[in-house]
């Protein structure tokens, strides 16, 4: 494996300034290979992406349905198509009602299962693939195929009874350990003289007291109106035989007994709040897999993994009260009645305790599960990656006050996810990677929650581009399912995902898409993310599905387009920030020009407020939102903590009612009541990017890499100057000088760019600008549209080599003020290739062996059922004649509409796969005067064949899969198969297909 680690760490920064420099490539998700291996230039790595920057795939074992032959077949296919690694995942019992899986072939972690996994590791090693394994028998939880006894997750329960004092109370309690119940506390809560709530047992005060039955789950918030004015811990009044003896003082008291029990139905799950339980689980499963890997651990088996959290949400754990005191600074027992619905002291105090309780649940989950697993993996020579609780349901107690960034920061490789189409959760893991110094931000890619096999390369590309712009740089494609031959085609599948295994019709054409992803990942691992702003929103930063347009649910400030930001949390603010030259900097090199404090609510920890003041005094510029903090969270040091927050808020925001404006604090600047964009521009920081498209910017030591994605033509402005822009096309690997650009008065560079539909490009600034370049072009059609008429192919010794597709006058103006005018001759007229076309289908998939299309017709509209319901590859063949003038100039083949990918050959020469716009192929130098033969193999998706088969009895169907339609009214209809009522997808070569001609012209300047 080529060692790519130094590109990530920034050693390559100086390399990028030199076009001919040699350099190592970017870090792979696993461990770096031997540094003595071959080094490649960045340009060469871009043209031919090395393994270390290629994407991975989720490799699903559907209930252990694999064998040695299928394992070898799958892994060889991954390697051949351009995957560099795999995440092995055998999940059982997860949404099996959506798409029922086949029967289990072998039990999870059984000797045969482990033998298959060992074989997979050796095959991956043979092929040079890296491997991660999901450390669970289930998706969405941490569990194995065995009951874990007392290590299972627990919930807090309570029961209560009312007594009236004074009196001597004696009663029998069921002893701890009965029914696997652990006592937590026995408390007596005195009310303020008003009638108390009814007891859970329904007993009156004069009746016998029972505290051993009628258990209830804890409550989310207090329901009683009368506050508890005193809480007494009477746990010590219970003797070894479970007999309570207590002299009840005067007053109305509620006795509340708290205990924890294992959550019903979760006897196989692990208590994620308990460090020892998690460690025992790792020792049982992780250690076994490490033993099986032997010398491949850390070499081929590089990671363990956990997916999004959808498992048990425990509300207590053994020893939780000690962890509470450790994290919150006080013992919780006096406030536990709040969890039984009582108000202790006041509603405000009760709310603060609830916040502390939920925060502690999150901290235990974060540190004792994810943090511990990372520690254990690292100790074993592996890395840990997970989605750290995503997709982050704030209704779950463990996540209500959790710090999303800190959760993700407990990974060696933070991971998010995005769904096709247009649903993403990529910004949080990218931000966590930036602020915690992790070089890679991963994403579960292309998860699909609709009917299967509808997706194809051109359709999913926009979502990939959006994820890249959101900051992730390592794709793990979801999903590549293991499906041995006996399951037929399309075969067995998991209920969700964009499928990409060899049973997928377009799998053999997937290589260029995977190379595209690899090139993007290579470039987005260079240098560091460029963001002008870091934003602190409070003690529980959180972003849900979306692009991070808002940094909290209630923003008072908005960052304008063309500026980028990262969230920072309290942990990073306290432990990783410093000020250099007025910028906020992190130990790993991230640098922000401005700290924004835009709070989600009025609650801030005093230590965070102190740190913000310290940063300002050290020289930072801080922009404050309208929401002024008034209190601290929780009960630590209450009420003096609130007083400190108010005092520090006054130092930052000024006195109540103070006017907006700018003022100094120490060496720094405080800005209140001003838009962030205005504050940045006042510091001489113009927008980083201006244009109609999505973008991301990576800053190098002496250069810049921008990725832009969108459709159409535009003049784009980049905040860099004195550098020659280059356009690096990730779809083809082509690199060319832009040549046409101009400098602005505010130190930026404007580059006209033309993108096809859902197109993208990298704009790289690394070399000093040439003394002469083109600053404007006027063609037959004025304005930036000229980019569609003229392409600057490359620089030449005399100026620039142009490709022209329109006749007429062109005028180029250079940076030296020179005007270069010329008249382009009319190119030959385009040739329409309407037909006839000979088309060959695969009879084994229901198509005619050969048929003639007089004109191009979508397969789904053809009268022949064998064509209309066909899925797979069909070969088109036609001939065309060119004269000498046509054959000697520029020639391109425009395919028009394609459903869904095409491979082109001219005169027997393969010209590659066409999978995305502009759906053209360069034929220059590949055609000849006279007759030429054109062959186009077109591949569609499985949909039409599956719809056709749904019309047939099972024994006559050509396809076979566990994904089938059960009932039209089934609530899981969208996850299932097809019916005759479903619409066919446009398929085949739809066109119009034509040959277009142009000419070359050298512009001298």
List PLM regions with ranges.
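Carbohydrate-binding surfaces of carbohydrate-active enzymes
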Residues: 56, 72, 85-86, 105-139, ...
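Boundary at the C-terminal end of the N-terminal hydrophobic targeting segment
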Residues: 20, 25-27, 32
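Aromatic-lined ligand-binding clefts that engage carbohydrates, nucleic acids, or primary amines
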Residues: 717, 880-907, 914-915, 934-938
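Acidic/aromatic-lined carbohydrate-recognition and catalytic surfaces
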Residues: 91-234, 258, 266
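Short acidic/polar inter-strand loop motif in beta-rich domains
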Residues: 263, 770, 816-820, 939-948
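Short, well-structured beta-strand segments enriched in hydrophobic/aromatic residues
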Residues: 891, 929-956, 960
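Mature N-terminal segment immediately following signal peptide/propeptide cleavage
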Residues: 38-85
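Bacterial N-terminal signal peptides
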Residues: 9-19
């Amino acid at each position: 494996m080529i060692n790519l680690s130094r590109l990530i760490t920034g050693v390559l920064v100086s390399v990028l300034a030199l076009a001919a420099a040699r350099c190592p490539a970017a870090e792979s998700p696993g461990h770096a290979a031997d540094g003595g291996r071959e080094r490649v230039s960045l340009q060469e790595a871009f043209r031919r992406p090395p393994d270390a920057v290629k994407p991975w795939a989720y490799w699903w074992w559907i209930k252990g349905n694999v064998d040695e032959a299928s394992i070898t077949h799958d892994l060889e296919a991954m390697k051949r198509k351009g995957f560099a690694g795999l995440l092995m995942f055998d999940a059982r019992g997860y949404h099996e009602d959506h798409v029922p899986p086949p029967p289990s072939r072998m039990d999870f972690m059984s000797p045969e299962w482990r033998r298959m996994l060992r074989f997979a590791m050796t095959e991956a090693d043979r092929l040079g693939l890296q491997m991660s394994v999901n450390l669970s028998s289930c998706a969405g939880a941490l569990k194995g195929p065995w009951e874990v006894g007392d290590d299972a997750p627990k919930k807090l329960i309570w029961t209560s009874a009312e007594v009236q004092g004074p009196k001597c109370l004696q009663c029998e309690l069921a002893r701890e350990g009965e029914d696997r119940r652990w006592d937590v506390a026995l408390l007596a809560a005195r009310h303020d003289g008003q009638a108390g709530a009814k007891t859970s047992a329904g007993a009156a005060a004069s009746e016998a007291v029972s505290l051993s039955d009628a258990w209830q789950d804890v409550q989310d918030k207090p329901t009683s109106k009368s506050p508890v004015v005193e809480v007494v811990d009477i746990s010590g009044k219970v003797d070894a035989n479970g007999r309570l003896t207590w002299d009840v003082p005067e007053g109305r008291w509620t006795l509340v007994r708290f205990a924890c029990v294992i959550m019903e139905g979760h006897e196989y799950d692990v208590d994620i709040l308990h460090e020892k339980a998690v460690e025992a689980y790792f020792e049982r499963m992780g250690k076994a897999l490490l033993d099986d890997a032997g010398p491949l651990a850390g070499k081929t088996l590089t990671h363990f993994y956990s997916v999004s959290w959808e498992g048990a949400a425990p509300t207590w754990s053994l020893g939780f009260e000690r962890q509470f005191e450790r994290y919150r600074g006080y013992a919780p027992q006096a406030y536990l009645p709040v969890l039984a619905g009582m108000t202790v002291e006041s509603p405000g105090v009760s709310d603060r305790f609830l916040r502390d309780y939920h925060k502690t649940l999150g901290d235990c989950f974060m540190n004792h599960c994810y943090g511990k697993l990372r520690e254990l993996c690292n100790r074993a020579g592996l890395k840990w990656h997970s989605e750290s609780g995503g997709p982050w349901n704030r209704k779950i107690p463990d996540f209500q006050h959790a710090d999303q960034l800190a959760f993700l920061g407990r990974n060696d490789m933070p991971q998010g996810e995005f769904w096709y189409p247009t649903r993403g959760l990529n910004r949080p893991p990218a931000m966590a990677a930036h602020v915690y110094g992790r070089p890679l931000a991963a994403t579960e890619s292309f998860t699909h929650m609709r009917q299967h096999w509808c997706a194809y390369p051109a359709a999913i590309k926009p979502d990939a581009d959006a994820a890249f712009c959101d900051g992730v740089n390592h794709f793990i494609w979801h999903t590549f399912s293991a499906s041995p031959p006996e399951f037929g085609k399309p075969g067995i599948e998991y209920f969700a995902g964009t499928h990409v295994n060899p049973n997928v019709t377009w799998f053999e054409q997937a290589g260029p898409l995977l190379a595209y992803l690899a090139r993007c990942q290579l470039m987005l691992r260079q240098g560091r993310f460029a963001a002008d702003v870091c934003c602190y929103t409070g003690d529980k930063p959180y972003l849900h599905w979306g692009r991070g347009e808002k940094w909290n649910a209630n923003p008072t400030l908005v960052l304008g387009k063309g500026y980028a930001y990262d969230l920072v949390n309290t942990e990073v603010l306290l432990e990783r920030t410093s000020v250099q030259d007025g910028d906020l900097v992190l130990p790993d090199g991230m640098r922000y020009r401005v700290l924004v404090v835009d709070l989600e609510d009025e609650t801030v920890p005093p230590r965070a407020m102190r740190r913000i003041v310290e940063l300002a005094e050290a020289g930072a510029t801080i922009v404050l939102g309208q929401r002024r903090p008034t209190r601290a969270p929780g009960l630590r040091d209450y009420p003096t903590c609130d007083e400190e927050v108010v005092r520090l808020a006054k130092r930052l925001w000024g006195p109540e009612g103070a006017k907006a404006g700018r003022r100094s604090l120490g060496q720094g600047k405080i800005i209140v009541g001003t838009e962030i964009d205005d504050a940045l521009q006042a510091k001489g920081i113009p927008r980083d990017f201006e244009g109609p498209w999505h973008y991301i910017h990576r800053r190098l030591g002496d250069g810049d890499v921008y990725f832009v994605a969108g459709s159409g033509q535009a003049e784009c402005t980049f905040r860099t100057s004195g550098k020659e822009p280059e356009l690096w096309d990730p779809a083809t690997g082509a690199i060319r000088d832009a040549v046409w650009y101009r400098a602005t008065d505010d130190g930026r560079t404007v580059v006209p760019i033309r993108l096809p539909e859902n197109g993208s490009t990298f704009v790289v600034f690394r070399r000093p600008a040439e003394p002469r370049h083109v600053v404007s072009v006027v063609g037959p059609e004025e304005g930036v549209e000229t980019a569609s008429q003229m392409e600057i192919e490359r620089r030449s010794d005399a100026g620039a080599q142009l490709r022209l597709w329109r006749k007429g006058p062109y005028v180029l103006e250079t940076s030296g003020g020179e005007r270069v005018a010329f008249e382009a001759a009319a190119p030959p007229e385009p040739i329409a290739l309407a037909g006839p076309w000979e088309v060959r289908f695969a009879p084994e998939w229901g198509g005619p062996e050969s048929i003639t299309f007089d004109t191009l017709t979508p397969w789904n509209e053809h009268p022949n059922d064998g064509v209309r319901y066909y899925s797979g590859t069909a070969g088109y063949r036609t001939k065309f004649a060119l004269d000498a003038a046509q054959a000697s100039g520029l020639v391109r083949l425009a395919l028009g509409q394609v459903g869904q990918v095409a491979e082109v050959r001219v005169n027997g020469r393969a010209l590659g796969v066409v999978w995305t716009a502009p759906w053209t192929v360069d034929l220059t130098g590949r055609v000849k005067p006279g007759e030429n033969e054109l062959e186009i193999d077109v591949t569609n998706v499985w949909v039409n064949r599956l719809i056709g088969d749904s019309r047939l009895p099972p024994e006559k169907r050509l396809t076979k899969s566990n994904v089938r339609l059960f009932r039209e009214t089934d609530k899981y209809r969208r996850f299932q198969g097809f019916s005759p009522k479903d619409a066919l997808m446009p398929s085949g070569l739809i066109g119009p297909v034509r040959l277009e001609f142009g000419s070359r012209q050298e512009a001298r300047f």
